[in-house]
Structures are given as structure tokens and as C-alpha cells.
């Protein structure tokens, strides 16, 4: 088992991509600590709350004494300029950017030799749809935070981010245009992200830090103009 007895922290690990990541680490022998707002057999808490982050970090260190891998995955909102309130926008940034920064700070002196931080961003850190400002701003923020932390923690902790594209967390299989619009010929699933997380956390990625890796089946490389290849903008 590649991660036997390694201590792994996953935020937002109750469902979706975070759950898949946590389960993959556990199968490889890791000791996995999860924090989520959903009730379950993990640390229950709101990542937007400073005191909760401090209690969670204290709990991890008290139980495990170190951190080998920190995966900042949690992200709560998807609202845009028409509907998103000031408070909702601030909350999205608190969970999506402030919490990853503060957890890195809280664990700074407890990271083991060769430790790794993996931040989950989004392909929306480089492209957008209307009415997605709260989510997009947070994902752009965590992508930038990644290279800043990589510089500050150089020689101690490797820090990288992953930008998923369309990931169906139910592992649904799509056909037709939904699939063919991707160069890879399909929609992604959580294992596509979990596999990269485990690679980046491993010694095989020992020379990779400060990087952002987009996993979107090639979608963001698909240059689209009206009337090209049957694409039509109806507006």
C-alpha cells in the first residue's frame, strides 16, 4: 500500500470528488481525517468558521501527530451576480480560499517530511459561464494561492492544484454531444481526479510543485466559434 500509515486530511469528504479521494487514500492504507458540514463519521464543522478550523486541526494533530497530505476540496456555492448576496459571496471565499490558507497555516509546523498539499480548483479558474461569480472567484483564488504557498513552503511541502472540468459525481455515462465535445470522448468522473491527487501526493511527483493541472478531457482546448463544426450560438 503506497500510503500505509500516512496521515491524509480531506475537506468536503462526505460526497462527490472528496469522498472518492478519501476512499482511494484509505484503500492505500492511509489514515484519513475528513471534515464536512454533513453529518457522518467524521469531524462535523463549517469550514467558514475560524474556531472550527482550529478545533479540527487540533483534533488531527492530537490523534495523528502529523500531516502527510492536505487535500482542500470543499466548495459550497454556485451563484452569480444576479442572485448571490454579499454574505453568500463572502462565504464562498471563506470556504474556498480562506479555509485552505488557514489550514495550511495551522498544519505548517506539523507537516511531515515530503508532505503535499493538493488544492481542488476548477476549469472555471480560466473560463466562465454567466452567473457563476462566487464559485469562479473562489476557484481562481485557490489556484493562485497554490503557487504562493509553493513558494512559501519550498523545500518542506509541495503544493499543487487540480482544475477539474465536467465531472459527473454519480459516475453517469454520457453519449452524443455531451461526450463528443470532449477530446477524450467522454465526461469525467471522480476517479479521474482522485487518481491525479494520489499521484501528486506520492514520491513519483517529487519534482512537481506550484503547478496547476487541468483535467477536463481537453474541453478547455476546444476552440469554439459560431458555425464551426455545427456549433451555433442561439442568442
Predicted regions and their residues:
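Conserved NAD(P)H cofactor-binding loop of Rossmann-fold oxidoreductase domains
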Residues: 73-78, 218
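Substrate-binding pocket helix/loop in short-chain dehydrogenase/reductase
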Residues: 80-90, 178
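Active-site helix of classical SDR
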Residues: 104, 138, 146
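Alpha-helical segment proximal to the catalytic Tyr-Lys
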Residues: 109, 150-155, 206
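Residue(s) in the substrate-gating loop at a strand-loop-helix junction
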Residues: 122
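C-terminal helical subdomain
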Residues: 161, 176-208, 215-217
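Short C-terminal tail/terminal secondary-structure segment
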Residues: 209-235
Amino acid at each position: 500500500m503506497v500510503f500505509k500509515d500516512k496521515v491524509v486530511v480531506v475537506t468536503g469528504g462526505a460526497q462527490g470528488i472528496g469522498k472518492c479521494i478519501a476512499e482511494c487514500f484509505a484503500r492505500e492504507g492511509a489514515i484519513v481525517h475528513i471534515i464536512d458540514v454533513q453529518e457522518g463519521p467524521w469531524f462535523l464543522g463549517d469550514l467558514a468558521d475560524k474556531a472550527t478550523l482550529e478545533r479540527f486541526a487540533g483534533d488531527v494533530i492530537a490523534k495523528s501527530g502529523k500531516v502527510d497530505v492536505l487535500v482542500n476540496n470543499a466548495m459550497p456555492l454556485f451563484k452569480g451576480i444576479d442572485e448571490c448576496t454579499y454574505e453568500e459571496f463572502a462565504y464562498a471565499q471563506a470556504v474556498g480560499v480562506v479555509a485552505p490558507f488557514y489550514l495550511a497555516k495551522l498544519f505548517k509546523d506539523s507537516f511531515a517530511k515530503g508532505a503535499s498539499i493538493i488544492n481542488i480548483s476548477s476549469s472555471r479558474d480560466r473560463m466562465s459561464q454567466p452567473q457563476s461569480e462566487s464559485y469562479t472567484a473562489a476557484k481562481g483564488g485557490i489556484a493562485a494561492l497554490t503557487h504562493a504557498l509553493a513558494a512559501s513552503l519550498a523545500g518542506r511541502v509541495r503544493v499543487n492544484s487540480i482544475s477539474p472540468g465536467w465531472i459527473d459525481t454519480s459516475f453517469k455515462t454520457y453519449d452524443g454531444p455531451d461526450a463528443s465535445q470532449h477530446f477524450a470522448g467522454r465526461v469525467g468522473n471522480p476517479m479521474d481526479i482522485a487518481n491525479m491527487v494520489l499521484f501528486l501526493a506520492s514520491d513519483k511527483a517529487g519534482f512537481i510543485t506550484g503547478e496547476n493541472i487541468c483535467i477536463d478531457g481537453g474541453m478547455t482546448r476546444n476552440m469554439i466559434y459560431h458555425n464551426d463544426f455545427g456549433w451555433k450560438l442561439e442568442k
